[in-house]
């Protein structure tokens, strides 16, 4: 299913960029539909039920996008997923879509986890350091985890940089065990 997810995400990225839609808005609007789907068990059941007619599913989609003002291109994309019974893949497609847009635009997504909330100055410094390492502009999301003791864990794509005290202690323990 990964290749299907990638194909749909790439196709949507092509359409969004060729129509010069605001990328941030397109990602947000697609994620709004994903959130509605995840939060509503009834809606998930509708998308997954093959006995419900495509026309009914499209009518439900039109009601949803009408409530949140989703652009026609995003609405049409989800309609294609409905037509091909691929709506259950929407959360993965949306994530892949965001990754593809970031790749095409030269951005790297980073997730920074620290023991406490970081100041704006610390965030800027971290983003500059990540940008130097990955050679791209960085869009960072920040979260906290009190179990880290100190330091930070930075995830860029599938690469993890563990600068936490907890991680350092685990490395020391591993080295001592190997000796």
UniProtKB/Swiss-Prot annotation:
Keywords: ATP synthesis, Cell inner membrane, Cell membrane, CF(1), Hydrogen ion transport, Ion transport, Membrane, Transport
One MF term in the entry's GO annotations: proton-transporting ATP synthase activity, rotational mechanism
Gene3D superfamilies, per the entry: N-terminal domain of the delta subunit of the F1F0-ATP synthase
Protein name as catalogued: ATP synthase subunit delta
NCBIfam families, alphabetized: ATP_synt_delta
Gene transcribed to yield this protein: atpH
Similarity remark: Belongs to the ATPase delta chain family.
Subunit structure: F-type ATPases have 2 components, F(1) - the catalytic core - and F(0) - the membrane proton channel. F(1) has five subunits: alpha(3), beta(3), gamma(1), delta(1), epsilon(1). F(0) has three main subunits: a(1), b(2) and c(10-14). The alpha and beta chains form an alternating ring which encloses part of the gamma chain. F(1) is attached to F(0) by a central stalk formed by the gamma and epsilon chains, while a peripheral stalk is formed by the delta and b chains.
Bilayer disposition of the protein: Peripheral membrane protein
Superkingdom of origin: Bacteria
Subcellular location: Cell inner membrane
GO cellular component: plasma membrane; proton-transporting ATP synthase complex
Chain's role: F(1)F(0) ATP synthase produces ATP from ADP in the presence of a proton or sodium gradient. F-type ATPases consist of two structural domains, F(1) containing the extramembraneous catalytic core and F(0) containing the membrane proton channel, linked together by a central stalk and a peripheral stalk. During catalysis, ATP synthesis in the catalytic domain of F(1) is coupled via a rotary mechanism of the central stalk subunits to proton translocation. This protein is part of the stalk that links CF(0) to CF(1). It either transmits conformational changes from CF(0) to CF(1) or is implicated in proton conduction.
UniProt-listed InterPro entries: ATP_synth_OSCP/delta_N_sf (IPR026015), ATPase_OSCP/dsu (IPR000711)
């Amino acid at each position: 299913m990964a290749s299907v997810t990638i194909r749909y995400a790439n196709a949507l990225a092509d359409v969004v960029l060729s129509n010069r839609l605001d990328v941030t808005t397109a990602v947000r609007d697609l994620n709004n539909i994903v959130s509605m789907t995840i939060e509503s068990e009834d809606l998930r059941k509708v998308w997954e039920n093959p006995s419900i007619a495509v026309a009914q599913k499209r009518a439900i989609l039109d009601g949803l996008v009408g409530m949140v003002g989703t652009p026609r291109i995003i609405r049409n994309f989800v309609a294609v997923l409905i037509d091909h019974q691929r709506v259950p893949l929407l959360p993965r497609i949306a994530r892949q879509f965001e990754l593809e847009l970031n790749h095409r635009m030269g951005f790297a997504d980073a997730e920074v986890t620290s023991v406490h909330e970081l100041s704006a100055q610390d965030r800027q410094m971290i983003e500059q350091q990540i940008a130097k390492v990955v050679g791209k502009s960085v869009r960072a999301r920040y979260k906290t985890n009190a179990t880290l003791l100190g330091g930070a864990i930075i995830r860029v794509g599938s690469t993890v940089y563990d600068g936490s005290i907890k991680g350092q202690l685990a490395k020391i323990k591993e080295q001592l065990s190997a000796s």
